[in-house]
Amino acid sequence: MAAEEKDPLSYFAAYGSSSSGSSDEEDNIEPEETSRRTPDPAKSAGGCRNKAEKRLPGPDELFRSVTRPAFLYNPLNKQIDWERHVVKAPEEPPKEFKIWKSNYVPPPETYTTEKKPPPPELDMAIKWSNIYEDNGDDAPQNAKKARLLPEGEETLESDDEKDEHTSKKRKVEPGEPAKKKK
């Protein structure tokens, strides 16, 4: 009991986990304290009385027995140098004002006309020859070649598919005459 009065933090050591204490402290524990760690079912009803008897020490008593860490002291004045431990936040540069982009109509001073480049040039001779279907030998040829069907295939369109652009393909055998629509 006398050892408990000298060290006010022994209250926490008695009920703390075994991993937090050192092996030297575990060797010095009296049998009473070890029996106190394991709660007996008979004493569990009277546990409230035991807690009332064991109270934490007051702050004055606690700080008389506990030593303060050395890094808090200024060796010349033997007082805590709080200014040395103050950490200041880094200063942020002033933010530049940026105009929000929104859907409102901008003032007339800020109007700018968008300059669109001309579309890629189209050879008008090719366009006119396509319009008037003047595709003779002397007509200018378009750089893009039309994709032709492979030999032996021709497209068939049914009456139902005249409106649609899809068409059916069927293979034509070399000896078979081509069928015409009725």
UniProtKB/Swiss-Prot annotation:
Residues 50-63, 172-182 have a biased composition (Basic and acidic residues). The modification Phosphoserine is found at residue 158. One of its GO terms (cellular component) is nucleoplasm. The modification Phosphothreonine is found at residue 67. Keywords: Phosphoprotein. Residues 1-67, 100-182 are annotated as: Disordered. The modification Phosphotyrosine is found at residue 132. Residues 23-32, 151-162 have a biased composition (Acidic residues). GO terms for molecular function: RNA binding. It holds the Pfam family DUF4660. Expressed in all tissues tested including heart, placenta, liver, skeletal muscle, kidney and pancreas. Weak expression in brain and lung. Belongs to the UPF0690 family. This is UPF0690 protein C1orf52. It comes from Homo sapiens (Human). The gene is C1orf52.
